[in-house]
């Protein structure tokens, strides 16, 4: 009747204990078995599980691309860009506050419960789009508290992959995100045009429910049981899971600080671009729904190639830091092109460059993961996701304000190509926010130059021992892993032959 969490002296104690007291280990063991049964899922943790979770969640939201533009314009006919930035801004700020906390708690209680929670609350606003637009936008803002699926997913992947495999694994997860956006906007636009927005919302809701069921039934827990406490009743103090305490180490470790500044300066314009770009294509460039869908599909397909085929080759030949620098260079180029471009062909050309810039995030995630110990991956990825959440709050508001200053407003839902729009398209800088974003990314590039190429350290752990102080000592890394290059062998088929404990079953 002993459990794994009992000490060697416990059998002797049970021999002299009363029957009532001796029943306590049985209850604790049965409770632990019951709580762990739903964590098992199918097979060993793999990139397959992470990829399906990401795909379903963002596929559901991708279906709503066209209906969301309609509801946004109908709800806020005046200053649409500005209100869009405000809504996304509140969501991003809440994500910034919650991401380190959720990442730290997932290091203690496991990844699966928080995967379930983040997906559920992130997708909760979907059916509200047809019920009440005001409630829909309100819940989108509040859902930012749990909109940190990527941080939990990357920590999930880090639990079962070796250090030199993670950049490839992160690339596949990010590519799955791009793949979910290849077809879903087109499907959503087709259903909306032929059957109405209500059917699109229904399909998106069903896909979100399918994702939740997949996590419940199929996704196995990736965090080793000996790292987790014996039960959910374990005492977790606020100090152990304080998001601000976990953020304090950013200033104490120079490498982590440089990485975080790089992420902030590079993702700030990217977040603003994501929040307003489809509206910009309609209002300023004159793209219709079909062209927007085709544009998303093209960029998505090219992003998949960039984050799978090219990323592994670049990491092997250039190294982690230089791959990040290359991605930032592509981002500067595409933002400048969007800023000066006023014709449709320029948008298509800049989209190919934008796809190549998508290698930055998985490369940065691999870089921060190398500075975190095995039991601190959730905290490490939570910091990055928290900073991205802050950018999701500031970026859309910044872009919306710049559009407002330059009198770019969504006066009509469809493409507007009349004489009122000609002066803007003929202006020297048709897209001022994008050019401003290129300047910010240039600053990020300069900061990234000072990131060390490789430094093995307990960076995240040594300043965050309070998160795992009550847990058992994590398994030590082997010395061979400490000296091996970043991506010894990134062939995705060979990675799938690893032992179950360190398996990286690629897509």
From Swiss-Prot:
Sites where a glycan is attached: 464
Region (Disordered): 1-22, 462-483
Pfam family, one: MFS_1
Residues exposed to the Extracellular side: 1-51, 106-113, 158-170, 220-257, 305-323, 369-389, 452-507
GO cellular component: membrane
UniProt cross-references to PANTHER family, sorted A to Z: HIPPOCAMPUS ABUNDANT TRANSCRIPT-LIKE PROTEIN 1, MAJOR FACILITATOR SUPERFAMILY DOMAIN-CONTAINING PROTEIN 10
Organism: Rattus norvegicus
UniProt family annotation: Belongs to the major facilitator superfamily.
Residue ranges crossing the lipid bilayer per the database entry: 52-72, 85-105, 114-134, 137-157, 171-191, 199-219, 258-278, 284-304, 324-344, 348-368, 390-410, 431-451
Ranges of the Cytoplasmic topological domain: 73-84, 135-136, 192-198, 279-283, 345-347, 411-430
Any GO molecular function: transmembrane transporter activity
Keywords per UniProt: Glycoprotein, Membrane, Transmembrane, Transmembrane helix, Transport
Localization per Swiss-Prot or TrEMBL: Membrane
Topology in the lipid bilayer: Multi-pass membrane protein
Comp. bias intervals (Polar residues): 462-473
Protein name, as recorded: Hippocampus abundant transcript-like protein 1
